[in-house]
Curated annotation (Swiss-Prot):
The RING-type zinc finger domain mediates binding to an E2 ubiquitin-conjugating enzyme. GO terms for molecular function: transferase activity; zinc ion binding. The keyword DNA damage does not apply. A zinc finger (RING-type) spans 136-176. Keywords: Chromatin regulator, Metal-binding, Nucleus, Repressor, Transcription, Transcription regulation, Transferase, Ubl conjugation pathway, Zinc, Zinc-finger. It is found in: Nucleus. Residues 316-325 have a biased composition (Low complexity). This is Putative E3 ubiquitin-protein ligase RING1a. Homodimer or heterodimer with RING1B. Interacts with CLF. Component of the PRC1-like complex, at least composed of RING1A, RING1B and LHP1. CDD domains: RING-HC_RING1-like.
Amino acid sequence: MSVKNNSFSSAEIPDVADQPRDRFNPEATQDLQEKDETKEEKEGDEEVKHDEAEEDQEVVKPNDAEEDDDGDDAEEDEEEEVEAEEDEEAEEEEEEEEEEEEEEEDSKERSPSSISGDQSEFMEIDLGEIRKDVQCPICLGIIKKTRTVMECLHRFCRECIDKSMRLGNNECPACRKHCASRRSLRDDPKFDALIAALFTNIDSYEEEELAFHEDEMARNKQIQASIAQISQRQSEALVKRRSLGKEAAVLMRSPRIASGSRRRRNSRNMEQQNASEAHEDDDNDDNNNRGRDKDSSSDERGTEVRQKKRRKRSTSRSTQHPSSSGANKNNGNCADNDTEVYRDTKGISPGLVWNPEILAWGRGGTRSNTRHGNNTSGGSSKSVRNARVNKLVEYLRSSVDGSSVELDIHVKLVSLDTKCIPDLPQPYLCCRPTLLVKQLREFVALQIHLKTEEVELLVTRRRVGEDAAIENLPAVTPASAAASKDEMLSLEDNETLSRLKIDFISSHEQHLIIAYRKKQTE
């Protein structure tokens, strides 16, 4: 008989941490005790059955034992086969479940476009929509021989991007991202293959794009016709406005026609009177000049007659034009006379704009400004001519006497040693008085193909009143250089031509003669 074992396994022992609240519950403790008792009874029954089975096996005969062993082996084999089949079925079910899960995941990952692509092998593509994606940003044409910028992945034609990089633009033309050199460019044959598949003939496609279609031609004709109609309407409206403006101007000017005709008649009468008086003065002057040698008394009579006529004219003009009385006092100063006349005539006719630069008709038909000087006083042509001559003389005197006027100096350049240095093809020059000798030396050096430091400019040394022709001087050689120093004077760089003209040119000479030679080393 086996000893009854009342021990418990670790799984059967209740954990105090799992049941903290049942420790102080009496009902929970009773339940545990009942469970333990039932377990002990079951274990005891099993042990009893086991002991009985062992006793039966000992009593059974050997033959029976062998038969029982064969039956047990067959049963075990059948059980093993059933278990193997069940395992295989379970594995197959697991594999099927895994495949279904994978298919579900693949279906989730797939997009609608891929599903449609699986359904149909080919897609319809509109080339107009893809045109922008295959366009070169530089030439705006379809990309040929694609090159991709590695920094930004923008694509260009090979010729376009190479030309841009040669010009020194080390940046992407599309996004202005810096590119170090052409090494950052890569060919893209796959993109070229895609373009070749989409556009079989790129040149013909671009020609079709550039060509005008019939609809566009009709639309352009309509636009041109509408523009022509609008321009015609505008021109007609402008013509109408001009005609209306002219009619209004004629209506406004009609009251002034009578006054204008009177002024014209008065002006004509005054011009005729002035011309006749001037003619009489000229005749009297000629007669007086002819008889001056014969009789001195005729001069006195002529002067008296002229004075009387001038007094008559001045009195008549003062009565007709009181504003011009002050202007007759001085015929030489035309600007003062003009200003005085305009100041006086402002009160007479305030409707006119009295600007000395604007020609206007004054009272009695006389002009406020004439072509040559002031003629408002009706002076003779001889007095006007004398005033003009006086003005010209004064201007010439001021220009000659003034220090600001500088005349050009005529210079002649001559070579002292014609064997070494030839004469210039154009030796005569016209220079400014402020020109320096240094600048002239640079010019000579440039003409004879020498350095500026190797050229020396000389001028004849002479006393006042003496003239020396430098053209007649003998050729200077290194042996005679010391002797020529006494006759010639070397010029400094800071000297001006005006100073040389005063010191080295005589009154009857027309040119300042300057010689040049190669500077001699001592």
